[in-house]
């Protein structure tokens, strides 16, 4: 078998894989049009906010829909025109999977075990789509630590899956919505955790705070900093 030697500098060329999360109404879906040449997989039916962007999308209502969409993205000639895939949202997909498992399995613990296995495989499959940027959005989970601090992280059904989710991605970005000193609402992507908000980036090219423009962020990661 021939060994194929690659260089780490070309990793971004295979696509940047991002998980972003935030509160309802933060504008996670509005990040999709900022991706290079995107197609959306909508499991939430919440694309009205980007209606004017006229983004192509595939409606996901069942696991069969998701599996069919994956095979189309992986194998079809038509999918090659899209540089980015957005799955909105992975939290909602997990809820669909869990409901299906609970219908099939009376043992709740076994159902959650199947959920973890199914979602791990699904996330890896979409994350590893070659030559495509991949964005997955997630809901926000708030928890409290032993010191009484409120912690923020991406949310999934089941404690185990919630804890595993960030490890699948090189980039985990909360979409923050805050008021500035003058009372104006500001939206920004956070790329580094502060002990309260879970965030991470494998790239040294990003600032702690970035504008909510994933195309610009991807260019920075790929060494095309403007």
Language model segments and positions:
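Conserved P-loop
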Residues: 2-87, 91-96
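A general structural signal for short secondary-structure junctions and capping/turn motifs
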Residues: 10, 30-32, 126, 162-166, ...
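Alpha-helix C-terminal capping segments
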Residues: 31-36, 126-129, 221
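Structured loop/turn residues at beta-strand edges in well-structured enzyme cores
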Residues: 33, 80, 129-130, 167
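Short, well-ordered beta-strand core segments
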Residues: 38-40, 134, 172-174
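P-loop NTPase motor core
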Residues: 84, 89-164
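Conserved GTP-binding G-domain of TRAFAC-class P-loop NTPases and closely related GTPase folds
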Residues: 142-226
């Amino acid at each position: 078998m021939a060994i194929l030697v690659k260089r780490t500098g070309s990793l971004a060329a295979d696509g940047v894989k991002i998980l972003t999360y935030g509160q309802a109404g933060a504008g996670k879906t509005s990040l999709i049009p900022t991706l290079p040449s995107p197609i959306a997989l909508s499991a939430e039916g919440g694309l009205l906010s980007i209606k004017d962007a006229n983004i192509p999308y595939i409606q996901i209502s069942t696991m069969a829909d998701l599996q069919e969409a994956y095979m189309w993205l992986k194998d079809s000639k038509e999918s090659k025109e899209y540089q980015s895939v957005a799955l909105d949202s992975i939290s909602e997909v997990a809820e669909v999977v869990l409901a299906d498992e609970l219908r099939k399995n009376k043992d709740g613990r076994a159902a959650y075990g199947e959920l973890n296995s199914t979602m791990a495989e699904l996330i890896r499959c979409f994350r590893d789509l070659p030559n495509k940027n991949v964005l997955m959005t997630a809901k926000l989970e708030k928890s409290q630590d032993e010191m009484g601090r409120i912690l923020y992280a991406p949310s999934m059904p089941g404690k185990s899956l919630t804890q595993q989710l960030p490890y699948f991605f090189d980039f985990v970005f909360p979409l923050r919505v805050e008021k500035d000193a003058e009372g104006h609402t500001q939206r920004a992507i956070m790329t580094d955790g502060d002990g309260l908000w879970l965030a991470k980036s494998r790239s040294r090219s990003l600032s702690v705070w970035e504008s909510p423009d994933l195309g610009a962020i991807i260019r920075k990661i790929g060494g095309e900093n403007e």
